[in-house]
Amino acid sequence: MNGNHKQALSGVTLAAIGVVYGDIGTSPLYTLRECLSGQFGFGVEPASILGFLSLIFWLLILVVSVKYLSFVMRADNAGEGGILTLMSLATRNTPAKWTPLLIILGLIGGSFFYGEVVITPAMSVMSAIEGLNIAAPSLDPYIVPLSVLVLTLLFAIQKHGTATVGKLFAPIMLTWFITLAVLGLNSIFQHPEVLGALNPVWALRFFAKYQTASFFALGAVVLAITGVEALYADMGHFGKSPIRRAWFMVVLPSLVLNYFGQGALLLAHPEAITNPFFLLAPKWALLPLLLLATLATVIASQAVISGVFSLTRQAVRLGYLSPIRIVHTSEQESGQIYIPVINWMLYISVVIVIMSFEHSSNLAAAYGIAVTGTMVLTSILSCSVARHSWHWNKYLVAALFVALLAIDVPLFAANLAKIFSGGWLPLTLGAVMFTVMTSWKSERFQLIRRLNEHGNSLEPMIASLEKSPPTRVAGTAVYMSRVVNVIPHALLHNLKHNKVLHERIILLTLRVEEVPYVHNVRRVCIEQLSPTFWRVVASYGWRETPNVEEIFHRCNAEGLSCRMMETSFFMAHESLIMKERPWYLYLRGKLFMLLQRNALRAPDQFEIPPNRVIELGSQVDI
């Protein structure tokens, strides 16, 4: 490996530290405090301290290091990861009868992420600012307003992109992880007996001693691995090797040292349970640590916000959400996007959550259900990929499946116990998003099928028009066509009402494939159907934005002359009329009509000049 490559790789590794590990890296702020807060019925005593530390350590090893970094990250779609990507991979080679179930599981996983994303910024930022209690107890009433202020500033700058401030993320997070390690080491040196918790026997003793209470305590232990999905979701931005290297070289050692440092502090001073993280620091370091913690939690929140933007774009491109406005904030990086409606809906939700729960300890009850639910679904989908795409031995996959669920299911079940104390929040948000996605996909499919049922077959219609041509006018007309073998409705309406056709007709179909990018050589496929009709099929990946001007440029390069200002774009606009339905389908139809009315119009989706667009309306029963 040459020097330049090593330097580039280390730079990407540093960048991964700054983005990927923000959420899991700020978990020491609250995890051990919530584990030992007394809610499970046992006090701050050596058996519980060492038991929790052992559970946290082995969760970091088994879930993060083994499951995600060694197994799940093998499943990539042209380098991209994430739950919807995993869903796409799982449905490729699986028997058709299982496909609907796998799609539903993938959509539930995506919906869980929307539930989690509301809680993460609130939980992280509040936990950091609660350090004011230690530095200046009189400032306690200002924790909620300060948390809202910090997050207001964060959401307000989203429209400007994070390319500039993003350069600071990596050094800040590296400083954060070094600080975690130093604080923990200092405490461990004073009480090295805490290292005994590395032995999994302490976890087993914990279960044996506390029995039922220890099961429910898993709901707090899981806070140590919140954000683990980011490792897989951000794989496309940084690559597998930098993410793995960052974990094993920096993040894992720092987290373990800090957790064990907090444990050592609690062994000597049980009263430090009020906030063991900040009490690790000497008094002179409290304010700098508070500032650093706030910056780290803001960065963690930024990573989650960027993640929900990326997930939303993928869902829109794959047809699970209605088209919405997506703004690219960087000319160099396609991943730098801003979605106004998602940004402000998320901001309002986060502020409501902060003002309702008022303290991170109250919010901790809501945290974990979405994370562990996604973990279960990830295990199911990744094992499906291992069996049907990688063709692993079925007995090996079965053993792996059982081993993964033996960890994931108890964690999820323990978190279900928190439904009435806050766990309802992510479940409700997830249920809303699942309803929206399935309603849009199902109703859109039915609408297109209904339109095509009454459509005319392409070839016979073109032959008829060439044989008995209507009046022709100069110029080029482009008709957007959803299906390549059916005449577009806009063309039929134009013939019906205007009785004319342009001298050149292009039937344009835009396809989004289940890959992040489509190679330029496959971008456009041109077929001449008759002397005056052409069919153009343009293919895009879900990370790309369809652009008609680019399509025209490629058509020109392949011999089909297209000029934007000499072309008219004809598009169909459907007015939907609801037929009689059962009440639950009626509600779904009403939701679809609401989404359709507020969806981004096709000219805006495909960057077509508005003065070149002609929309022809029709009524459609649904």
Curated annotation (Swiss-Prot):
Keywords: Cell inner membrane, Cell membrane, Ion transport, Membrane, Potassium, Potassium transport, Symport, Transmembrane, Transmembrane helix, Transport. GO terms for molecular function: potassium ion transmembrane transporter activity; symporter activity. One of its GO terms (cellular component) is plasma membrane. It is a multi-pass membrane protein. It catalyses: K(+)(in) + H(+)(in) = K(+)(out) + H(+)(out). The chain crosses the membrane at residues 9-29, 46-66, 99-119, 137-157, 169-189, 213-233, 247-267, 285-305, 337-357, 363-383, 396-416, 419-439. InterPro entries: K+_transporter, K_trans_C, K_trans_N, Kup. Transport of potassium into the cell. Likely operates as a K(+):H(+) symporter. This is Probable potassium transport system protein Kup 2. It comes from Aeromonas hydrophila subsp. hydrophila (strain ATCC 7966 / DSM 30187 / BCRC 13018 / CCUG 14551 / JCM 1027 / KCTC 2358 / NCIMB 9240 / NCTC 8049). The gene is kup2.
